[in-house]
């Protein structure tokens, strides 16, 4: 499904996505510095996919040495590949790790060495944005992680401004509704809302990305 993000009216997101890079326990790697000094095999689905984007961007901007192997049909296949020893690391959201592999975290079979996007309060791993130094590199990093704000988004197509304002207010009220929050907790959904106005500003910033930065990102991911 294709759509023009700039023409959408973004109402809000239930929670942003905190992206991570994690390594399997059999690897000696426990930090970003470790991946700067030794090669680590990272599993991914395809070039341009999120699972490819994060290790590729870290290689480009942070000097890591992820060897990215593509061809896996989704995250579950990459998880199995880690268990088999085919790969040693992968990208995934923090909420997904906690929901699908809590025993891996508890038993220290998996170590998160980096996070991206809004900082997770219950995760000590460093932020890759904070480690990016030059202004040019920061522009590329900001573009790469811009999607983390969207998480579980709500949006509508062309609509009058007053209707958009009403929908955004309704979304904001829902995010504070005790009944909704209780049900979300029961279902294990994290609620850390991102306002629609903030999402709209992010889209506008991405669309205004300098051509040189966009070209660099395209070359990196293709």
Model-derived features with residue positions:
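Ligand-binding clefts/hinges and TM-proximal coupling segments of bilobed small-molecule sensing domains
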Residues: 139-160, 179-193
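A conserved hydrophobic position in a structured secondary element of the catalytic/binding core
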Residues: 23, 156, 175-176
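An extracytoplasmic/periplasmic, membrane-proximal ligand-sensing/linker region
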Residues: 106-108, 112-113, 133, 162-222
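A generic structural signal for alpha-helix starts
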Residues: 27, 159-162
